C-alpha cells in the first residue's frame, strides 16, 4: 500500500494557533485540523522582540494541539502574521552569480531604506522575474533573528520541527494559487484575522504588495483598499488590473465582495475555500472551522 505524503501547517496569530494536516499537492485534501486560543498574556506580536511572553503556556498549547491532531508528522511549515516582519519588492539591474552574492547585494541595497541592523535580520528572497537585459525582480522577506530563533526553539520543545517560516498573506495566496495563476493581470484582495492584504500581479509577476491591520468596518476597508489602488495606479500607470479575486470569512464574504466591487469598479471573483480543498475521509468541518485553517493549510501545502 502506497501512503500519500502529508504536510503539516501551523499558523500562529493573535487569535491563537491553527494546525492543519493536508495531502494531495495541487488538489489539496484536508486530513485534519483544529484551532485553539492561547491563554491571555502568552503572545505579543512584534517585529523586533521575541513574541512569546509565556513560553510554558505556548509550548503546552502547541504540544496539546499536535497530540489532538493524531498524526506522527512533526515537520511543520509555519505561518506568521505579516506584521511581525517586512516584505519588500526589489528591482535590481543584474542577476547574481550565487545566492550568497544575492543576499549581500540585497543587504547593501536595503541599508538606505531600513534604519535597522540588517545583521540581526533573517533575510530571504525569491526571484519573481528575469528580463532579457539581466535585470531581476525580487520578493524579499525580513524577520528579526531573535523572533525566528524563539519560535524555532519553542516549537522544537513542543515536539515539532519547523521546516519553513513564511508570512500569512503568501500562504493564503498559495491556497488559491491554482485559480489565481490562470489570470496574469490580477488583484488578490483578502481580509483575514483583521488584516487587509492586496497583492497585484502583472504579466504573472507580483508587482504590488500591501498588508495592513485595520478594523473591519466598511469605511476603513474601503479607505485602505482605495489607498492601495491609488498607489498602484500612480506607480504603474500602464499596468491595468484585468481581474479581481477576493476572500473573507463566511460571515463577511458577501459584504466584502460588494465592497471590493465598489472600490475597484470591477466584479470580483469570490474565492470559496470549500471548492479549493476537499475533506478527507472521516474529516468533518463546518465553513467557519475550515476558514480558520486557511493559512495553516496554505503552509501545509508548501511541504507537498
What are these regions (language model features)?
Residues 1-304:
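Hydrophobic/aromatic-enriched cytosolic interaction surfaces used to assemble or bind macromolecules
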Amino acid at each position: 500500500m502506497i501512503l500519500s505524503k502529508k504536510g503539516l501547517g501551523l499558523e500562529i496569530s493573535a487569535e491563537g494557533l491553527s494546525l492543519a494536516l493536508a495531502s494531495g499537492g495541487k488538489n489539496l485534501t484536508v486530513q485534519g485540523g483544529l484551532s485553539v486560543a492561547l491563554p491571555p498574556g502568552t503572545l505579543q506580536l512584534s517585529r523586533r522582540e521575541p513574541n512569546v511572553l509565556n513560553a510554558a503556556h505556548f509550548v503546552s498549547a502547541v504540544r496539546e494541539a499536535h497530540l489532538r491532531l493524531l498524526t506522527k508528522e512533526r515537520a511543520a511549515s509555519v505561518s506568521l502574521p505579516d506584521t511581525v516582519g517586512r516584505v519588500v519588492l526589489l528591482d535590481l539591474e543584474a542577476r547574481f552569480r550565487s545566492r550568497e552574492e544575492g543576499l549581500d547585494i540585497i543587504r547593501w541595497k536595503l541599508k538606505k531604506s531600513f534604519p535597522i541592523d540588517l545583521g540581526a535580520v533573517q533575510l530571504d528572497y525569491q526571484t519573481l522575474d528575469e528580463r532579457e537585459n539581466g535585470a531581476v525582480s525580487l520578493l524579499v522577506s525580513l524577520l528579526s533573528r531573535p523572533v525566528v530563533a524563539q519560535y524555532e526553539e519553542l516549537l522544537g520543545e513542543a515536539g515539532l520541527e519547523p521546516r519553513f517560516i513564511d508570512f500569512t498573506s503568501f500562504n493564503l495566496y498559495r491556497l488559491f494559487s491554482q485559480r489565481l495563476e490562470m489570470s496574469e493581470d490580477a488583484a488578490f484582495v483578502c481580509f483575514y484575522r483583521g488584516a487587509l492584504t492586496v497583492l497585484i500581479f502583472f504579466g504573472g509577476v507580483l508587482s504590488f504588495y500591501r498588508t495592513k491591520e485595520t478594523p473591519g468596518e466598511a469605511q476603513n476597508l474601503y479607505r485602505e483598499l482605495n489607498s492601495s489602488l491609488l498607489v498602484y495606479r500612480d506607480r504603474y500607470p500602464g499596468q491595468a488590473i484585468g481581474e479581481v479575486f477576493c476572500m473573507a470569512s463566511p460571515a463577511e464574504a458577501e459584504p466584502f465582495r460588494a465592497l471590493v466591487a465598489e472600490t475597484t469598479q470591477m466584479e470580483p471573483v469570490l474565492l470559496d475555500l470549500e471548492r479549493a480543498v476537499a475533506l478527507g475521509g472521516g474529516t468533518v468541518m463546518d465553513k467557519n472551522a475550515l476558514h480558520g485553517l486557511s493559512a495553516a493549510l496554505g503552509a501545509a501545502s508548501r511541504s507537498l
